[in-house]
A protein has these predicted regions:
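Gram-negative bacterial Sec-dependent N-terminal signal peptides
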Residues: 24, 41-71
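Short, Lys/Arg-enriched N-terminal segments with co-localized hydrophobic residues
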Residues: 19-40
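Sequence/structural signature of beta-propeller domains
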Residues: 75-549
């Protein structure tokens, strides 16, 4: 580091080149004085603290300055004069990734483009993903339905026995019958995968683009469709339900294997009709979700709004329900988020994507058009959404991805909102504050999925790209800004025809699962008359010591 007296800046002598990181230079009153680095460290820390850097970054920078790597850097950058501080911190974050993320050396680059078709039956799991040092990939199954997307652990995140997956394929009659020969076989929409042996069974058929899926606190599964008329379906006892079929999506008619009306799955018409993906569900039954809509898709219409469903009868307690009629999702009201740049009132004109917000009442059946009519804030394709279980403030923190479009220089982002009163929704009460948390760039862009790592609170951002990457991002520290303190790349998909999706951690934060979605299956056999995807288990994540005590 070089410190110059501002009054004598023009007359300062040239700093000698070739000074190693074993020393620091202090230029003052026309004199160059050489000081041992150790004796100057307290002054360095004091100066960096004055700049407003958080303790983590100060410690990181100081530790790096003491390292042999900086000796080479200091010489190359003329006594640290030319070293870019952002690069300095980024390299340090990567070199100390075990401390901050619990993984070894991160990836320097994404996986190289592959030949097509890439996927074959002979490949092992490591052929599917490039991963950070210390991580290990293995197959859960290679027989999940093609376009396997998001999933929920069952019966819990702590001790899961199954993954309950949404399959994002279109509604399709497969040209044959279910066992028994009476019911036409449609595309798989919701599947369960047994973790002990990788066996796959279909729970529900006949959906359109099943995407967002969550386990509720009352032990049901909520599965949703990413379509302009996308519906939401609640499933009870998902391990005991097989091959049920939606025969009429508009009416929500669902039959079991014998052609009888289903008693295990119901369409929740009180929830908004829209293109669902990310979902956050509180124990009371409040549902947060976004409409995956690109601005301009509809004439003179904004992008997708963020919605909140408030149940008419909020759930009390955490015991499982005995029948679907007991669910808080049976009735309630739907609201769209309207964000303002002003405090206490709604500004005219363009408006803001960040700021303080209120919830505006809309109808469930016409949520998308109503949101545009009442002036709800539109975003660029809201996709995944997660609740922050480690948030300790009042209310609920929910974070979601806006995919953007990298080709247009819109690299996408992660936004986070804090709703101080989840059960409240009033156009005159600005109970929500929204801010950007991660902003995309030329390397990390078009974020699609999102996950919190339990224990650490680290945020994982998953791209919607060929050879898509997964980035681990630190929470915001005590520094001045309100964004992530830095991200590293920990995984990249090797198959150019596929993307990573559905990434989620078990409750201990040490194991994650993901889908290698919509790969080119030319060289792979069909299963149950349908193309397949690989589901991967990633182990080797370590919880940094500071979170263990």
């Amino acid at each position: 580091m070089v410190v110059r007296s501002q009054a004598r800046m023009v007359n300062q002598p040239h700093v000698p080149t070739g000074i190693t990181a074993r020393s620091l230079l202090l230029v003052s009153s026309g004199t160059v004085r050489k000081c041992e680095k150790e004796s100057m460290m307290a002054k360095v820390i004091k100066k960096m603290t004055k700049w407003g850097l958080p303790a983590a970054k100060v410690t990181l920078a100081v530790s790096l300055a003491m390292s042999p790597l900086v000796t080479t850097q200091a010489t190359a950058f003329d006594g640290l004069d030319g070293l870019d501080f952002g690069t300095f911190v980024q390299r340090g974050l990567e070199r100390t990734s075990q401390v901050w993320f619990g993984v070894g050396k991160p990836l320097n680059a994404s996986a190289a483009p592959s030949s097509v078709p890439y996927r074959t039956a002979a490949q092992n799991a490591s052929a599917q993903v490039l991963i950070a040092d210390g991580l290990k990939a293995e197959y859960v199954t290679r027989n999940a339905g093609n376009a396997a997307d998001m999933f929920a652990f069952w019966p819990s995140d702590e001790s899961p026995t199954h993954l309950i997956f949404c399959i994002e394929g279109g509604r399709q009659d497969l040209g044959t019958f279910l066992p028994g020969g009476m019911i036409r076989k449609f595309n798989p929409g919701v599947q369960r995968i047994k973790l002990s042996d990788g066996s796959v069974e279909t729970i529900l058929r006949g959906t359109i683009a099943c995407d967002g899926i969550r386990r509720t606190a009352w032990q049901t599964i909520l599965a949703t469709e990413e379509a302009s008329d996308g519906g939401a379906y609640e499933i009870i006892n998902p391990l005991n339900v097989t091959n049920q079929t939606i025969t009429d999506r508009t009416l929500g008619t669902i039959i079991d294997e014998n052609g009888l009306p289903s008693t295990s799955i119901v369409k929740r018409t009180a929830l908004p009709k829209m293109a669902w993906e990310g979902i956050g569900i509180t124990p009371e039954g409040v549902v947060y979700a976004g409409d995956e809509l690109r601005p301009g898709t509809l004439a003179n219409a904004d992008g997708g709004a963020m919605f909140k469903f408030v149940p008419a009868n909020p759930r009390v307690g955490n015991s499982p329900i005995g029948s679907l009629s007991e669910s808080p999702l049976t009735a309630g009201n739907v609201y769209a988020l309207q964000v303002s740049c002003q405090s206490g009132s709604q500004q005219l004109g363009q408006g803001c994507e960040i700021g303080n917000g209120a919830w505006i009442n809309v109808s469930a059946a016409n949520a998308r058009t109503d949101a545009n009519t009442v002036g709800a804030t539109g975003y660029y394709r809201p996709e995944d959404l997660e609740l922050d279980d480690l948030f300790d403030g009042p209310g609920t923190r929910f974070c979601w991805t806006n995919t953007g479009l990298a080709d247009g220089g819109n690299y996408g982002e992660v936004l986070c909102g804090v709703d101080s009163s989840p059960l409240t929704a009033n156009a005159t009460q600005r109970t929500v504050v929204v801010n950007r948390f991660v902003e995309g760039d030329q390397d990390m862009n078009q974020p699609d999925n999102f996950a919190f790592q339990p224990k650490t609170g680290n945020h994982y951002v998953i791209e919607d790209n060929p050879n898509g990457d997964i980035f681990a991002c630190l929470p915001d520290g005590a520094d001045r800004d309100i964004k992530t303190d830095g991200c590293v790349k920990i995984l990249s998909v090797k198959d150019t025809s596929a993307e990573p999706t559905g990434f989620k951690f078990t409750a201990d934060g040490k194991t994650a699962y993901l889908s290698i979605q919509h790969s080119d299956d030319t060289s792979m056999p069909k299963v149950d008359d349908y193309a397949t995807d690989d589901i991967i288990k990633i182990t080797g994540f370590r919880i940094p010591f500071r979170f263990q005590h």
